[in-house]
């Protein structure tokens, strides 16, 4: 029988994959009231990132500031899904957004995002989860799994 007392197991993955909607994961170290006023949007131009942003709309609308986080310039993203396009779209809607592009190797993505979240005093992250096949995630690991194991800030994920 698997151990389900921590998020360091299969339960969060199964919840995310089968919930049919967004899941707000709150790290065990989180204390205080949940009032996300500074939101980090992990953006790679994917369908999952767009869906996560759409699912976070109630939080985004109430935020004091948003920061779009892209890794390595979101390599290979078409212009219509770029971080610049996202920033312009949200700014047109009157939302207070900035962007940060960070460079990281595949194995450092999750720690780099969490470090940036701390630097920017982010109250919540928004991201897609498990965007690669189960085989790919199983063989190479994944940002989602690493994030679930080490998150330091509440994170809204969508699959």
Which residues are covered by each model-predicted region?
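Intrinsically disordered or low-complexity boundary/linker segments at protein termini
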Residues: 1-69, 150-159
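Residue-level marker of alpha-helix boundaries and capping positions
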Residues: 2-3, 77, 104
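A short, flexible beta-alpha/helix-coil linker loop
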Residues: 3, 72-74, 131-133
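Charged helix-capping and loop-helix junction motifs
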Residues: 9-11, 81-84, 114, 139-144
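Alpha-helical scaffolding segments of alpha/beta enzyme cores, especially the outer helices
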Residues: 14, 58, 85-88, 115, ...
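Short, well-ordered secondary-structure micro-motifs
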Residues: 36-37, 52, 77-82, 110-112, ...
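Redox- and metal-dependent alpha/beta enzyme cores, enriched for Fe-S-associated oxidoreductases
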Residues: 45-96, 100
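Structural beta-alpha unit
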Residues: 92-125, 129-136, 145, 153
